[in-house]
Amino acid sequence: KFNALVEEGAGFEEDRDEYEAENIFWVPKEARWTFIKDNAKDSKIGQYIDDAMILIEKENPSLKGVLDKRYARPEIDKRRLGELIDLISTIKLHQNGEKDLLGRVYEYFLGQFASVEGKGGGEFYTPTSVVKTLVDMIEPYQGRVYDPCCGSGGMFVQSEKFVEDHQGKIENLSIYGQEMNATTWKLCKMNLAIRGLDANLGPHHDDTFHHDLHKTLKADFILANPPFNISDWGGNQLTDDVRWKFGIPPAGNANYAWLQHMVYHLAPNGSAGI
């Protein structure tokens, strides 16, 4: 977008309204990659990166408290940090490249991290093939989409792709999610931000069963890959919960609780893919 505005020659490349109109989050000059790259060999590069993260959060409230700001720590080798920046800077990105390139790179690394983590990686990442199958089945073309255990946001990203592939308007899709793990919640926020997707993930990470952040939500579509067979979900503290319309879930297994939670939040004519 920046390069396109420069080519127009009207001087609007630093007008943040031009970016916000297309749901592109604004990055101040001192937080842009060109600034970081130009200072890669400076001994204060860690502080420059931390300052850049602070600026981005300040200009984009949806990312407040999400970005890591610990690059100035003494234990981080600033020479190697600079070398990493130089290495990344060798990647050639051109103006007419794929719109979703950064998002695809982010998704690739999420998949790699999940692979390394093994079974534990499933807590924040569902394979793209599985997500695509679920989305293609329930067809979230427009309406409210909800994932009560959203992980890194794969269901939302694939829903956006579905809308685009069917010539729909992404603004007709409202995204709601909740995530218990603090780090994973941040991963999801960043994943959606770099794709320009607005979402209501609640003001913080939290337990879906014990602190439902979307109590009144009735979703048109629910997409989820819940962590099955959780035994210590605290069910004995929720025996009178309004969500258990079809019986109290067993205290030693959360599977039935997940199903009832989703049924409770589903609109009368809604669809769910689990």
Where are the predicted features?
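Short acidic (Asp/Glu) and glycine-rich catalytic loops that position anionic groups and cofactors
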Residues: 85, 198-204, 237-242, 270-274
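Conserved Class I SAM-dependent methyltransferase catalytic core
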Residues: 134, 185, 250-274
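Alpha-helix N-cap/helix-initiation motif
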Residues: 83, 120-123, 177, 247-251
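Short, solvent-exposed loop/helix junctions and linker helices
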Residues: 78, 216, 252-256
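Mobile active-site "lid"/loop adjacent to the S-adenosyl-L-methionine
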Residues: 228-257, 273-274
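Non-catalytic, mostly N-terminal accessory regions of nucleic-acid modification and defense proteins
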Residues: 1-141, 200-213
